[in-house]
Amino acid sequence: MKYFNGLFSIFFFLLLTNYLNFNSRISNQLNQMLLDDGWIDKVKQLTREEMERSDSTNFVDILNKVEPQALNMVNDKTRTEILQTIKEFLNDIVEV
């Protein structure tokens, strides 16, 4: 039983490491694409405008107003490429 637990621990560690590497890679890719598209600057401006317009400086209140607009502003090409990368990762680790 100890042998099995050891193998399970190694398998879990490898799976977790793979996920974390993927998570870092996808996050970096997404950040770069959003930066290249000008999305980050647009969302910063949108947030500033909302803070000036709103009586609230509460993060959650501002986020609730800005987030739907920000999500709609993501370039279709960026959205498609990131979703494809996620699908490829899932296909590699999940057997159907």
Curated annotation (Swiss-Prot):
InterPro entries: TF_ENY2, TF_EnY2_sf. GO terms for molecular function: transcription coactivator activity. It is found in: Nucleus, Nucleoplasm; Cytoplasm, P-body. One of its GO terms (biological process) is protein transport. Gene3D superfamilies: 1.10.246.140. Keywords: Activator, Chromatin regulator, Cytoplasm, mRNA transport, Nucleus, Protein transport, Transcription, Transcription regulation, Translocation, Transport. Transmembrane segments: none annotated. Component of the nuclear pore complex (NPC)-associated TREX-2 complex (transcription and export complex 2), composed of at least SUS1, SAC3, THP1, SEM1, and CDC31. TREX-2 contains 2 SUS1 chains. The TREX-2 complex interacts with the nucleoporin NUP1. Component of the 1.8 MDa SAGA transcription coactivator-HAT complex. SAGA is built of 5 distinct domains with specialized functions. Within the SAGA complex, SUS1, SGF11, SGF73 and UBP8 form an additional subcomplex of SAGA called the DUB module (deubiquitination module). Interacts directly with THP1, SAC3, SGF11, and with the RNA polymerase II. Involved in mRNA export coupled transcription activation by association with both the TREX-2 and the SAGA complexes. At the promoters, SAGA is required for recruitment of the basal transcription machinery. It influences RNA polymerase II transcriptional activity through different activities such as TBP interaction and promoter selectivity, interaction with transcription activators, and chromatin modification through histone acetylation and deubiquitination. Belongs to the ENY2 family. This is Transcription and mRNA export factor SUS1. It comes from Kluyveromyces lactis (strain ATCC 8585 / CBS 2359 / DSM 70799 / NBRC 1267 / NRRL Y-1140 / WM37). The lineage of its organism: Eukaryota, Fungi, Dikarya, Ascomycota, Saccharomycotina. The gene is SUS1.
